[in-house]
Amino acid sequence: SAGGSTGGGAAGLAAGMFPLASGTDLGGSLRIPAAFCGVQGIRPTVGLVPAGPKKLPFQSLGVPGPMARCSHDLGVFLEVIAKPHHLDPLSPGFSFKFSEKRVRSVLRLAYIKDPAGIGIDKEVADKCLETFHALSQLGHKLDIIEVDLADGREAFEVLRAQSMVNAYLDYTEKLDEMGENISGNIKRGLGQNPKDIARAEITRGEQWKKLAETFNSYDALLTPTLPITPFPVENNYPESIDGKLTRSYIDWFSTTFV
């Protein structure tokens, strides 16, 4: 699998078909394929890259962003597309400027092995630790820390389902014509009540606060992008992670959305 949803963009970058690609990222749609294909993709801060006129201008889950083969190209591309836009109410009143100049020569970095609490396959965990030690040898200060974001999984599922209802409101009578993943999310969203959504938003705020507080001590947080390596393209999703059965379609990319 090339990952998704911007799997074509990531595969094309890796194959040398084009130098840049773009897409949107709600729960990992830029970062997942980038990780599977060995290129780079980021989910920018909400509003940094304007979406322009759209049906739901105030939604803050899915955001547009760039993909590239290296961090330099990614930064330059982001500078080009991250501009204010008067038809995007979440767009800030400034442009993003890319710079390769370091804020400080020695960075304070924290590694969170399993932020979603779903386990990490050994091959992925070993590679992450190799990178961790390589950064340490370059002189950066690194700590292994624990930040429990497992509650974010349920909150994301609720908010994602609601976002699907918002996006496909005019098509709720045609669910039988849709794929299982989309129709399943819409059905869940239609069955939720306001308390479900309120609890999810509260959890979202609590998770954000946990992460924000870590930046009092660290310049950046390091995590595995995904807990698994690419799986066969014929499979809709992996059946297990670190020897444990997955409970739903989105378990395997929990690390990108908690």
Residue ranges and their predicted role:
Residues 122-146, 169-173, 197-218:
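Acyltransferase
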Residues 1-35, 67-68, 78:
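Active-site-proximal alpha-helical scaffold in enzymes
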Residues 40-126:
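A short helix-breaking turn/cap at a secondary-structure junction
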